[in-house]
């Protein structure tokens, strides 16, 4: 098939491909960008594959950066903006994956078929030439039409090469609303234990995208059916099942933190921060999720809880509670938030140094205690956030 019109991202990159072709080599748009065009989705990255070897690409273009030259990838700086920087990768074949993550070595080749047949799924194995002609060597167009995910060649080999492809399959099922072809799914089940060989950081990225997918239920169901969850840090099948049964069927997560909090509210006897530490997330992410889980356990909001958690988190929790079938007062959080004089400690008009100067106080626990009391009284609207009022209140304490 041929595209009626090249997308703007391809039009912008077209001169790069044409220059490679002028020098006697082949060059194509490949991978996820071609798939997304065919699905009518937004393109994120433009990937270019070529029969030219890395050194030949560097001879063609004056400005390049070696970003992964050992794997055949050179960054071509076709313009000043980052949007005009393109990763160009030589056609290649790959050796065995002894670590189930990356090939021991790659061999550069001139044949497009050899390059495409090493890819994970047929819907990711398309190539598109400068005129918009789609090259489909593995019947990916049929799979695309039938919304089916099929491994290229032997599914077992593909998953043994890189076990992360098991998570990618479930992520694609969730984000694209695809079903997984039977042989491919059976190979996923057989290879699921290999996920233990994959870094938890890489698994987190795929699982996180799965949860944010429009059909995350499909992805989560596949995670359970395949048994892959057993090889991910501390996932409880009972909790995953509760998420599927308890959340309203049309609910979609607003962000990653809300999605992970939704999971953790269904867990039994879990320390949120310990759990997330095993997933090696950032401290900031872990705190956000832990706050959501803590806030979820509250029956109602008051000034202190709004101040402590903040309106953003409270509204995310309210959404979650509604999705889990709990009755809440949707207006309560906003109403209470509007009653707060301050939303952060930094908004208090005085600081510790002001009290030290005014009352000849020394730094230490006593000063800290006074500041804490002042903060709480302001939050509860028992004290105005004004210097004179605060000084008068402190005077009473001393």
Swiss-Prot record:
Which InterPro entries does the entry mention?
Answer: Bact_CCA-adding_enz_type3_sf, CCA-adding_enz_C, CCA-adding_enz_firmicutes, NT_sf, PolA_pol_head_dom, PolyA_RNA-bd
Q: Which residues bind Mg(2+)?
A: 45, 47
Gene Ontology molecular function, alphabetical = ATP binding; CCA tRNA nucleotidyltransferase activity; magnesium ion binding; tRNA binding
**Highest taxon listed in the record's lineage:** Bacteria
CDD domains the record matches: NT_ClassII-CCAase
- Catalyzed reactions: a tRNA precursor + 2 CTP + ATP = a tRNA with a 3' CCA end + 3 diphosphate; a tRNA with a 3' CCA end + 2 CTP + ATP = a tRNA with a 3' CCACCA end + 3 diphosphate
Name the residues that bind ATP: 32, 35, 119, 162, 165, 168, 171
The alphabetized UniProt keywords are: ATP-binding, Magnesium, Metal-binding, Nucleotide-binding, Nucleotidyltransferase, RNA repair, RNA-binding, Transferase, tRNA processing
Q: Please tell me where CTP binds in this chain.
A: 32, 35, 119, 162, 165, 168, 171
EC number(s) on file: 2.7.7.72
Name of one Pfam family that matches: PolyA_pol_RNAbd
List required co-factors. Answer: Mg(2+)
Gene Ontology BP term (one): tRNA 3'-terminal CCA addition
Q: Which Gene3D superfamilies match?
A: 1.10.110.30, 1.10.246.80, 1.20.58.560, Beta Polymerase, domain 2 (3.30.460.10)
- Family per similarity comment: Belongs to the tRNA nucleotidyltransferase/poly(A) polymerase family. Bacterial CCA-adding enzyme type 3 subfamily.
The annotated subunit structure for this chain is: Homodimer.
HAMAP family for this protein:
CCA_bact_type3
Stated role: Catalyzes the addition and repair of the essential 3'-terminal CCA sequence in tRNAs without using a nucleic acid template. Adds these three nucleotides in the order of C, C, and A to the tRNA nucleotide-73, using CTP and ATP as substrates and producing inorganic pyrophosphate. tRNA 3'-terminal CCA addition is required both for tRNA processing and repair. Also involved in tRNA surveillance by mediating tandem CCA addition to generate a CCACCA at the 3' terminus of unstable tRNAs. While stable tRNAs receive only 3'-terminal CCA, unstable tRNAs are marked with CCACCA and rapidly degraded.
Remaining remarks? A single active site specifically recognizes both ATP and CTP and is responsible for their addition.
What is the name attached to this protein's record?
CCA-adding enzyme
Gene from which the chain derives: cca
